[in-house]
Amino acid sequence: MSNNTDLSPVHVIGGGLAGSEAAWQIAQAGVPVVLHEMRPVRGTDAHKTEQLAELVCSNSFRSDDAETNAVGVLHAEMRLAGSLIMACADAHQVPAGGALAVDREGFSQAVTARLEAHPLITIEREEITGLPPTEWGTTIIATGPLTAPSLAEAIAAETDADALAFFDAIAPIIHFDSINMDVCWFQSRYDKVGPGGTGKDYINCPMDKEQYEAFVAALIEGDKTDFKEWEGTPYFDGCLPIEVMAERGPETLRHGPMKPMGLTNAHNPTVKPYAVVQLRQDNALGTLYNMVGFQTKLKYGSQTGIFKMIPGLENAEFARLGGLHRNTYLNSPVLLDNVLRLKSRQTLRFAGQVTGCEGYVESSAIGLLAGRFTAAEKLSQAAVPPPPTTAFGALLGHITGGHIVTDDEPGKRSFQPMNVNFGLFPPVDVPKPEGKRLRGKEKTIAKKRALSARALADCRNWLSLY
């Protein structure tokens, strides 16, 4: 690390996981940083301490398996990149099977101590109530899902009122190769061809009356997750949980998101479905499909059981389960460029959950990328995005443009927060052992190993550029 104290400092707003990682990466590159954190001057209903990188929910960083799990691959890539968050997590690990879980207090204290001790990092405990003044120059905003209202309003004013969401309306997402296409079929309602469409843009899962009634009953009876007190989220009709719609009456769903009109079962064209669940392509690769209109507050265990009642989804593998909770995140594919800068004001860069990633590790990873991109620019170097074959690149690609924009639902947003998963990675050829044809679980594991190996090799090559 060489010190470039003659450089003007980079300002980082937000001392959570992403902001802490971004500040560390910048300082490690020899560029001075001012890290602004509003706690303890102003607290939140979720945070309990004034430590940086406080974990407000679980203490788990999820799977540490870098061979067959996408988040484990992201762990490995972050370690290769000298991540502060991963170093402190490893140092404060607690037993958790194959997962990386941490002593939450020891972890956040360690992050805070490392940042406070760094000679190029200055920590300012103050609330930033608006967008940074132009004299600050390069600034990273990493204020997370609980961004203070005044700053959120300033961001909304700069970007456009519709560009900042305050609720996650998350529907489950399913791996395409786990959908039974002997039961389901491709068709858009009334064979409508939209922009970039073919008239066969949805996967349709048919139900007869008996299946529909059993499904509605299961939704009503399923275990629900209550809103956390600090979320204070009212229901609104444009984003009602699927189980709340079911409670409004037995016919509500089949006249709403499960309406069968305009659809003909390609496998049995003479029989009209009583109800239909539609799945819409979720990423440009076509490896992931989301359940249209199925935002939910059902507990995860209930979701998997109930949604596998849907014909064609009996063996569904979920890349993400549904949810509805308070959040603050940008419509990043529209607003940010491929190195996380605001297109309309390129001295501003965003990082962490405010960009539309989901999870501790993902937020930290985007903070790491934002820090590296910023440091490169300050040192008059090129900010080179990671390849899409890496976990870094797959996640960045989702945030900055890997989702599908649709015009068939006026007023609704197609971009939703996402955890890293193999469905975001470009496909890979799976090597076949001589004389052996891989099937089932064996084939799935081989595919994941191939994706992981390619990701780590490509990540090493990318890091060699810096």
Curated annotation (Swiss-Prot):
The keyword tRNA-binding does not apply. Its cofactor is FAD. GO terms for biological process: tRNA methylation; tRNA wobble uridine modification. Keywords: Cytoplasm, FAD, Flavoprotein, Methyltransferase, NAD, NADP, Transferase, tRNA processing. Its EC number is 2.1.1.74. GO terms for cellular component: cytosol. It is an enzyme of class 2 (transferase). It catalyses: uridine(54) in tRNA + (6R)-5,10-methylene-5,6,7,8-tetrahydrofolate + NADH + H(+) = 5-methyluridine(54) in tRNA + (6S)-5,6,7,8-tetrahydrofolate + NAD(+); uridine(54) in tRNA + (6R)-5,10-methylene-5,6,7,8-tetrahydrofolate + NADPH + H(+) = 5-methyluridine(54) in tRNA + (6S)-5,6,7,8-tetrahydrofolate + NADP(+). One of its GO terms (molecular function) is flavin adenine dinucleotide binding. Its main location: cytoplasm. It is found in: Cytoplasm. Gene3D superfamilies: FAD/NAD(P)-binding domain. It comes from the Bacteria. InterPro entries: FAD/NAD-bd_sf, MnmG-rel, MnmG-rel_CS, MnmG_N, TrmFO. FAD binds at G14, G15, G16, L17, A18, G19. Belongs to the MnmG family. TrmFO subfamily. Catalyzes the folate-dependent formation of 5-methyl-uridine at position 54 (M-5-U54) in all tRNAs. PANTHER family: GLUCOSE INHIBITED DIVISION PROTEIN A (PTHR11806), METHYLENETETRAHYDROFOLATE--TRNA-(URACIL-5-)-METHYLTRANSFERASE TRMFO (PTHR11806:SF2). This is Methylenetetrahydrofolate--tRNA-(uracil-5-)-methyltransferase TrmFO. It comes from Brucella ovis (strain ATCC 25840 / 63/290 / NCTC 10512).
